[in-house]
Amino acid sequence: MQVSEHIRRAFQAERCGQMRRALSELYLALEETARREYGDAGDQKGQDNTARLITEHLQTILSLWPNMPIAKNLKIPCPAPELEEQADADGYCFLDIVLLWLMKRAAEEKELPVQWHTEPVLGVWDGALHLSTGLTWALMLLIVTRKANRNEHLEELEVAGISVTAMINELWGNERKLKKMFPEAVWEPELTANTRQ
């Protein structure tokens, strides 16, 4: 399936409040984008390429995700027992690890321990991960603007009866155009995985 079809489905799911489906489609789009960008082999440390794409571009994701803190090596409380072995001594996990875990769970159609908010939220409390829906937009923009996806094309996409097809189609593989739209965003990939202690 084309990356553009996953983006269309993610967009529609997000509009209907089906966040697990939106994350599942975004994970599949990220997988294909990472395969196109890095090839089929993982990186030197054995990290899969989808994880690599998220890790290297986490600061871009955060800066496109409305009102989120932009920090290298951002950690949040570990939201699930299966992530505890990747947590530090204080029980905190790197955000990119949590996002990848969440998206994989969505793709596997597993329950997501998430409370979604329309206002800017990022944290773990009352046994749930709290996130704002702006995450899906940030991921969509990252995927669409990757050079590896420059040959993608959407047929039709509407928001509240208004076509956004032309705008999205202008962004495929065009990070430069998005940089003009969001000049305050962080655009340089971070080799975060190689700098962690």
Locate the predicted segments by residue.
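Charged alpha-helical initiation segments
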Residues: M1-S24, G39-G42
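Amphipathic alpha-helical segments of tetratricopeptide repeats
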Residues: L30-E31
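Short, flexible helical or helix-coil boundary motifs
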Residues: H57, I61-K72, C78, A106-K110, ...
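Histidine-centered, metal-coordinating catalytic motifs and their short helical/loop contexts
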Residues: K75-P120
